[in-house]
A protein has these predicted regions:
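Cofactor-binding loop segments of dinucleotide-utilizing enzymes, especially the Rossmann-like FAD-
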Residues: 10, 33
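Aromatic pocket-lining residues of Rossmann-like dinucleotide-binding sites
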Residues: 21
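Conserved dinucleotide-binding and phosphotransfer motif residues
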Residues: 24
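Conserved Rossmann-fold NAD(P)-dependent oxidoreductase catalytic core, especially the SDR/UDP-sugar
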Residues: 27-29, 86-135
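NAD(P)H-binding glycine-rich loop region in Rossmannoid oxidoreductase-like domains
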Residues: 36-95, 108
């Protein structure tokens, strides 16, 4: 099994995760549009379009896990999330890597009961529907 961890995104969550993994002795590849990310001897930073599955596979032919820590601008979710999510899912399926997603609760929409995983995905807005579709496809 590969010890490589692919972290996509270098915001607060992605950078912190990459540093934690690297400090634990893991090999980490951080992929962003610009090639940014934390500096560490166990971290390799790469600039790439993560919606391109073939590029992800070229960068990391195998991995223990791929971590989705990206978030396109809200006004571009409907256009940008579907190909990114499909690429991550395809990567996990082809490599056997675990797909870990840093997400939010938008897919559920407004609720007036305690939130649990069994709540239906009833998002009324575009972004919530995009998020719900990503979850549905990843199940």
């Amino acid at each position: 099994m590969s010890r490589t961890h692919v972290v996509v995104g270098a915001g607060v969550v992605g950078s912190t995760l990459a540093e934690l993994l690297a400090n634990d002795g893991q090999e980490v590849i951080v992929i962003t549009r610009s090639g940014s990310g934390p500096t560490h001897k166990n971290i390799k930073r790469i600039a790439a379009d993560v919606s391109d599955l073939s590029k992800l596979l070229e960068i990391a032919p195998s991995a223990a896990a791929i971590y989705n820590c990206v978030n396109p601008p809200y006004h571009r979710w409907a256009k940008e999330w579907p190909p990114i999510a499909a690429s991550f899912l395809g990567y996990a399926e082809k490599t056997g890597a675990v797909l870990v997603t840093c997400s939010n609760l938008y897919g559920y929409g407004p609720v007036d009961v305690p939130m649990t995983e069994v709540l239906p995905l009833n998002a009324p807005g575009v972004n919530g529907k995009v998020r719900a579709q990503m979850w549905f496809e990843a199940k």
